[in-house]
């Protein structure tokens, strides 16, 4: 019998790959009448964090650097975060704590264990994060985006379904995208990607003669220069919309013929959900997580191609885009993504948690 859940605390922070799933879980739990509190770092000004969401900033730090001053500073931040998280959890009194990876969740997870609150985790990537691996020995269960990663954890692990961000098939954004062919969506990730913002526009303007009705929806990231990227498209006479962040990303993906993107877990999940072929350019850091994600997308999902950042050139990108926009290739990749999607779990994270309690 499923246990009644009244309150849930979410340990969040870091990049969009950790934050977006947490917000999705928050929305799903709120619809069930469950009170949700977000605890973490770096969300105060995050564009995804809407008004009315209960959030408390928790200091965090990872003392794994050689500089002794930084070690001391980060250790103090971690201790401060742990004490504040203990206080917030005592006041909120949740029935469980859910961690979404990244070291920003560390103080909250430690505080949750100290209060003996049941712990759950969510892993977005195909390579398990270190925090999730560490805490899996204490967790009641962990939900994952992709089933191959379940073997890496010491607790019950299962692929779960997370509701996607809101979208509308009749939205103005969707209509704008579908009025042009081809529509290409460029996503640099939640932190932006300078090399994508530089190389991709230069490559796409070279294709304007082949695709005169091409429309590009380019999300540069919150720290990037929108006007600089837009100038390249305008100079090349490419119809475009350049934005730092896109709240209606699913609308754009559903209307797109191709997406050019980093290979973070969240965008990979949304590309798969929208069944849109992709050219993935994985971020070379983050312990190689994105390259593993991209290889899975190419080799298992057969949904597109991968270009390593060190191999990225305008010429190569033009070749890959031309290949991807071929109607036969595009249809084949869409069908592959659709076939894989039909095999995926439909069990919600909420249902999985209730089974494990």
UniProtKB/Swiss-Prot annotation:
Its main location: membrane. It is a peripheral membrane protein. It comes from the Bacteria. Pfam families: Glyco_tran_28_C (PF04101), Glyco_transf_28 (PF03033). It catalyses: di-trans,octa-cis-undecaprenyl diphospho-N-acetyl-alpha-D-muramoyl-L-alanyl-D-glutamyl-meso-2,6-diaminopimeloyl-D-alanyl-D-alanine + UDP-N-acetyl-alpha-D-glucosamine = di-trans,octa-cis-undecaprenyl diphospho-[N-acetyl-alpha-D-glucosaminyl-(1->4)]-N-acetyl-alpha-D-muramoyl-L-alanyl-D-glutamyl-meso-2,6-diaminopimeloyl-D-alanyl-D-alanine + UDP + H(+). Its EC number is 2.4.1.227. It is found in: Cell inner membrane. SUPFAM superfamilies: UDP-Glycosyltransferase/glycogen phosphorylase (SSF53756). One of its GO terms (molecular function) is UDP-N-acetyl-D-glucosamine:N-acetylmuramoyl-L-alanyl-D-glutamyl-meso-2,6-diaminopimelyl-D-alanyl-D-alanine-diphosphoundecaprenol 4-beta-N-acetylglucosaminlytransferase activity. It is an enzyme of class 2 (transferase). Pathway: Cell wall biogenesis; peptidoglycan biosynthesis. GO terms for biological process: carbohydrate metabolic process; cell division; cell wall organization; lipid glycosylation; peptidoglycan biosynthetic process; regulation of cell shape. Keywords: Cell cycle, Cell division, Cell inner membrane, Cell membrane, Cell shape, Cell wall biogenesis/degradation, Glycosyltransferase, Membrane, Peptidoglycan synthesis, Transferase. GO terms for cellular component: plasma membrane. UDP-N-acetyl-alpha-D-glucosamine binds at residues 15-17, 125, 190, 290. Belongs to the glycosyltransferase 28 family. MurG subfamily. Cell wall formation. Catalyzes the transfer of a GlcNAc subunit on undecaprenyl-pyrophosphoryl-MurNAc-pentapeptide (lipid intermediate I) to form undecaprenyl-pyrophosphoryl-MurNAc-(pentapeptide)GlcNAc (lipid intermediate II). NCBIfam families: murG (TIGR01133). This is UDP-N-acetylglucosamine--N-acetylmuramyl-(pentapeptide) pyrophosphoryl-undecaprenol N-acetylglucosamine transferase. It comes from Chlamydia pneumoniae (Chlamydophila pneumoniae). The gene is murG.
């Amino acid at each position: 019998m499923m246990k009644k859940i009244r309150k849930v605390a979410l340990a969040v922070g870091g990049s969009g790959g950790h934050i977006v799933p947490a917000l999705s879980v928050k929305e799903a739990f709120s619809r069930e009448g469950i009170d949700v509190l977000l605890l973490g770092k770096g969300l105060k000004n995050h564009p995804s964090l809407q008004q009315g969401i209960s959030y408390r900033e928790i200091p965090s730090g990872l003392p794994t650097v050689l500089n002794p001053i930084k070690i001391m500073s980060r250790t103090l931040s971690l201790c401060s975060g742990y004490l504040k998280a203990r206080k917030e959890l005592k006041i909120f009194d949740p029935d469980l704590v859910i961690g979404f990876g990244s070291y920003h969740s560390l103080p909250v997870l430690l505080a949750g264990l100290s209060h003996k609150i049941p712990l759950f985790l969510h892993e977005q990537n195909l390579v398990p994060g270190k925090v999730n691996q560490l805490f899996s020995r204490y967790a009641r269960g962990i939900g994952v985006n992709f089933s191959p990663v379940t073997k890496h954890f010491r607790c019950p692990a299962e692929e779960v379904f997370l509701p996607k961000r809101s979208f509308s098939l009749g939205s103005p954004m969707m209509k704008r995208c579908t009025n042009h062919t081809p529509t290409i969506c460029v996503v640099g990730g939640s932190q932006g990607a300078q090399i994508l913002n530089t190389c991709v526009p230069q490559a796409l303007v070279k294709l304007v003669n082949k695709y005169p009705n091409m429309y590009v929806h380019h999300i540069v990231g919150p720290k990037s220069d929108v006007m600089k990227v837009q100038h390249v498209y305008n100079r090349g006479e490419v119809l475009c919309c350049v934005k730092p962040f896109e709240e209606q990303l699913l609308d754009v993906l559903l209307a797109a013929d191709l997406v050019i993107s980093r290979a973070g877990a969240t965008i990979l999940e949304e590309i798969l959900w929208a069944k849109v072929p992709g050219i993935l350019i994985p971020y070379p850091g983050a312990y190689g997580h994105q390259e593993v994600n991209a290889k899975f997308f190419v080799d298992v999902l057969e949904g597109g191609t991968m270009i390593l950042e060190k191999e990225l050139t305008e010429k190569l990108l033009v070749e890959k885009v031309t290949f991807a926009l071929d109607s036969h290739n595009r249809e084949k990749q869409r069908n592959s993504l659709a076939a894989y999607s039909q095999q995926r779990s439909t069990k919600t994270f909420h249902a999985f948690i209730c089974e494990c309690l």
